[in-house]
């Protein structure tokens, strides 16, 4: 083996020793399961390209409040992505994350927002187009149960 082959062998050996295997746990709420399955794959590939490290992201999903309670009670979450700031605040109040978490990243540390939509009957017979239309006589509003839906709060 020539000196280039020996050098390349040492370089490859050093690179494999320096690369890390990283495991993370993202504790999140139910509707984000599919989103994070895709996002985690993309992030892992990006991180590998940038650092050489292998990242495996495990997921735990459930109701936002239940997931907050799991973290408060000791589940070792590396990332928390919950439906409500209230649930993240509860974790911070118990000292599991920094109380100033909301100031850590742009947009109050919210990586995305939910879009509000109005679902109307076919043809929109009551001509509902904006928030003010919801208080017209004869218009009824149906919302999710705030006891079971993070989006309803």
Indicate where each model-derived feature is located.
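Basic/polar N-terminal segments that are highly enriched at the extreme N-terminus
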Residues: 1, 18-19
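Bacterial N-terminal signal peptides that target proteins for export
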Residues: 1-8
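Extended rod-forming repeat segments used as scaffolds/tethers
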Residues: 9-10, 37
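Short, linear, compositionally biased motifs with a strong N-terminal bias
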Residues: 10-11, 86
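N-terminal signal peptide c-region/cleavage motif recognized by signal peptidases
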Residues: 14-16
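N-terminal segment of the mature folded domain
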Residues: 20-148
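Short, compositionally biased segments
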Residues: 150-153
């Amino acid at each position: 083996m020539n000196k280039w082959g020996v050098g390349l062998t040492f370089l490859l050996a050093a690179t494999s020793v320096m690369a890390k295997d990283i495991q993370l746990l993202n504790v999140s709420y139910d509707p984000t399961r599919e989103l994070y399955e895709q996002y985690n794959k993309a992030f892992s590939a990006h991180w590998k390209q940038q650092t050489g490290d292998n990242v495996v992201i495990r997921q735990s999903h459930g109701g936002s409040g239940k997931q907050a309670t799991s973290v408060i009670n000791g589940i070792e979450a590396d990332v928390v992505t919950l439906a409500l700031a209230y649930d993240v605040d509860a974790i911070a109040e118990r000292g599991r994350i920094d109380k100033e978490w909301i100031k850590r990243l742009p947009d109050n540390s919210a990586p995305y927002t939910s879009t509000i939509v109005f679902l109307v009957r076919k043809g929109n017979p009551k001509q509902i187009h904006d928030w003010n239309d919801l208080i017209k006589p004869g218009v009824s509003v149906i919302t999710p149960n705030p006891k079971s839906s993070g989006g309803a709060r």
